């Protein structure tokens, strides 16, 4: 669903921000 996609996107964004 949309929530799952948003969650995934947030995780990726977080990962990029950390690196």
Curated annotation (Swiss-Prot):
It is found in: Secreted; Target cell membrane. Its main location: secreted. Expressed by the venom gland. GO terms for cellular component: extracellular region; membrane; other organism cell membrane. Keywords: Antibiotic, Antimicrobial, Fungicide, Immunity, Innate immunity, Membrane, Secreted, Target cell membrane, Target membrane. One of its GO terms (biological process) is killing of cells of another organism. It comes from the Eukaryota. Antimicrobial and mast cell degranulating peptide which probably acts by forming pores in membranes. Active against both Gram-negative and Gram-positive bacterial strains as well as against yeasts. Has little hemolytic activity. In the context of inflammation and cancer tests, is weakly cytotoxic to normal cells, induces calcium signaling but does not impact cAMP production. In addition, prevents LPS-induced nitric oxid (NO) synthesis but does not affect the IP3 signaling and pro-inflammatory activation of endothelial cells. Belongs to the xylopin-like family. This is Antimicrobial peptide Xac-4.
């Amino acid at each position: 669903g949309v929530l799952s996609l948003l969650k995934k996107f947030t995780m990726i964004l977080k990962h990029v921000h950390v690196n």
